Amino acid sequence: IAEDMSPTLGCYGDADAYTPNIDALAKESLLYTHAFAAYPVCSPSRSCLITGMYPTSTGTGQMRSAFPLPAGTRGFPEYLRDAGYYTTNNAKTDYNSADAARLVKDCWDQSSAKAHWRNRTKKEPFFAVFNDMISHQSRTMVWPHEIFQKEVQSKLSPDEIHNPSKLRVPSYYPDTKSIRKSLARYHDCVSVMDQNVGRLLKELEEDGLAQDTIVFF
């Protein structure tokens, strides 16, 4: 799961995106062209992902909601656990509900920054979620330049760092210096996120699981 993602990927036609790992995955995958987030804000959208229900149905549409879920609502990983799957979440649990703690307890065998399918019993089927924060607005727009250089640009080669002056500015944005800077930072973060996706795909290969695992991005 990536945060604050627009279709800023090569496989969706963004000529400025450098996302070789996701693009390679897309070439051998089903590519959704008419799929949209259930809600435009992160926590309400996450409540949809964990329950499989629209925030308008669960009462979780208000950001930072403490509203309880409708009676009997379960997180869908609970059903996977019932079926014998080892379920892991790495690591965000911002489910925007008074029931968030219960969802964490009932949905996940492991939920932490160390959660991984490799912690399961060998041959046990698994469902593993990895939440990549690097494209979150707090990183793309808020981090001071020094932190951004350390956490993002230091992981990219000079050719992979996006030059604000060379980016294509979508017509719905004003073509200003500030907008170009924001777009460049965002594209850099997405490039690092792509590296992280590549690392997970490599781990599946190393474990001999690549041909037996369904990967959703």
For each feature predicted by the language model, list its residue ranges.
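Formylglycine-dependent sulfatase
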Residues: I1-F217
